[in-house]
Amino acid sequence: MKGSVKKAIIIIGVLIVLVICVLLNLRPVENFQQKYEGVDLSADVEGAVREGTYTKYLNAHEDAACPAEDIEVDLFAYMEGEGVEVYENYEGEEKALYTDTESTVTWKVNVPEAGFYNLYLEYITVESRGVAIERSVYINGELPFDDAGNIIFTRTWTDASEPKVDNQGNEIRPSQVEVYKWQSTFCKDDMGYIINPYQFYFEAGENTITMEGVNEPMVLKKLTLAAIDDSVTYEEYLANCPGEGNSETNINYVQVVQGEDSTIRSESSLYAKYDKSAPNTQPYSVTNTILNYVGGETWCSAGQWIEWEFSVPEDGYYNITVKGRQNYARGSVSSRTVYIDGEIPFEEMEEISFEYENDWNNLTLADADGNPYKIYLTEGTHTIRLEATLGGSGILLEELEDSIYRLNQIYRKLLVYTGATPDQYRDYNIDQVYPEVMEAMDLESKRLYKIVDEMVAYTGQKADKIATAQTLAQQLERFVEKPNKITEEFTTFKDNITSLGTAVLNMGETKLGIDSLVITST
């Protein structure tokens, strides 16, 4: 009898805890709009300004045009070059330009119309250390913005062989080998904060472009000042596709592509893995190690991509479903850009997102109303590439990076005045000595509150990581109201800045596992 009562009490206790958790999740998310509404958050305060950002670069040329014509650079007519060599009859090309790890090469380019252009390159990697290639890009002898100093170019990897099976029936993952093939890309943000390729401003007339080696050699076959294309919407995409649908013999076509069967990938760490935790992972075995998914912990940084091949039996429209799992970061979403045959078919494919969920999620690529996108494919073999992106959170993380930079400026200024351990019994009159610091703290507090609101709106809930920004916003608000708190909490202030920096790094991770992709006729 006593045992039954005790068991009943435990059950009731568990139920109470579950009810409390549900009620907590149903609480309306706190909103801070009244704290920053009507405030010019773009204002600069003396001593707390970050120069050299891409945003400031764009703003400096905000009235510039976006010319419609591409301008191809003559790779082999370079003005100056160190660590460069012209290759002939190289990898199917009559000529190509080798650039060493520490190379510097400058080209002249005549620009008919001033404005913004993307920088488009076609390149191939060469055998080296196997890490990402890095270059700095200078326009007319100057770094246009700080992040142009580290433009990243990925490599291509594949399996050296089919998986082997040991005498116990366990699959052995094949080693990774580099694939040396021509690739095309635009110069873009390696952190993923800026989704679209960088826009570079060129004056009308003669300009120079300099590429300086930072890491690893590469061979170029093309460099173009590319006109900035407006991405098409799904509606526009459909309007440009043939009107014919699938034949009656093709209406039930289904092809399942296993995640572990990816053909190529951007890093050697994106190999096939095994999962025994979920029986709906396919293929599945309780007893043996079976390679049955790809990605996961290592597929975490913007720009990393995985590509699969698939085929369709005839021209027509097809739907695509991705079976993915984001069980790595509660309160976050993991996003991917979808490329079909090397191109993003329409702007809605720039970001597909997986919310946090313990189990696999079958995500059919569809609009906001759940209507599957119809992808037009011709008969034969095609590729689908999923590239990690920060999506809508990227711009918010960039704003947090800028905020951390400004907060460190504020901290260092106060550090010079008060020392690392301020006297708790001394009134430093910081609000009188440094009124600009108080103004900067007030503005930064409001910026952080706004970022918290926008991140919560994007993810649908407040994760612990973004709560760090709220903690700092509240502390800054407290400093403005009671300046004497600055010296009392000076060490905590520095710790909170450090914690926010760590949180930004963590929020910049976008981990995702892929079990399979399913292509079906419409």
Region spans (language model):
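Extracytoplasmic
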Residues: G3-S521
